[in-house]
């Protein structure tokens, strides 16, 4: 992605479910490959597909660190030490790879982590939300009910905004 970040509020309202749905499918594929094994996702991430822009005056080590920071994954991590260690083997302080940091008392508040039961609740919610949305579509429900979050709404880039009849007032 460009600068896309995982937004839990947008996810909750069904506006940012694609990443979780893809992860669900990846879990299903792995379960088929490894019957009888429990597949536990480590996290849900966006990867920055861009050329990182960093200062050319940096030495090689600082340059690599700056590039890693620019390309750091964004999303949510299952908060389990073994999972975090596999995602970033050199994890200490602030990770250059995942959205996580450590303090003397544990993980930093800026870390984007969910306890295993919270992470599983996100997956369960996504399955229910997806099923509900599919059911509504199959029943023919197609109302003009665009979302509104902050300064954005569903009409902003909609190609049908001029003909749908929805009053944005």
PLM feature spans:
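RecB-family 4Fe-4S metal-dependent nuclease core
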Residues: 1-169
């Amino acid at each position: 992605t460009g600068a896309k970040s995982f937004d839990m509020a947008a996810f909750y309202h069904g506006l940012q479910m694609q990443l979780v749905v893809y992860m669900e499918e990846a879990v299903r594929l792995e379960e088929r490959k490894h019957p009888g094994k429990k597949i536990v996702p480590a996290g849900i991430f966006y990867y920055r597909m861009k050329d990182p822009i960093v200062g050319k005056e940096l030495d090689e080590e600082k340059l690599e660190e700056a590039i890693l920071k620019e390309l750091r994954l964004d999303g949510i991590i299952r908060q389990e030490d073994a999972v975090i260690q596999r995602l970033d083997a050199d994890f200490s302080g602030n990770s250059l790879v995942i959205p996580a940091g450590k303090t003397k008392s544990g993980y930093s508040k800026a870390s984007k982590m969910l306890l295993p039961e919270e992470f599983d609740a996100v997956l369960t919610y996504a399955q229910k939300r997806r099923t509900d949305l599919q059911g509504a579509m199959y029943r023919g429900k197609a109302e003009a009910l665009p979302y509104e979050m902050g300064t954005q709404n569903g009409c902003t880039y909609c190609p049908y905004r001029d003909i749908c009849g929805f009053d944005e007032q």
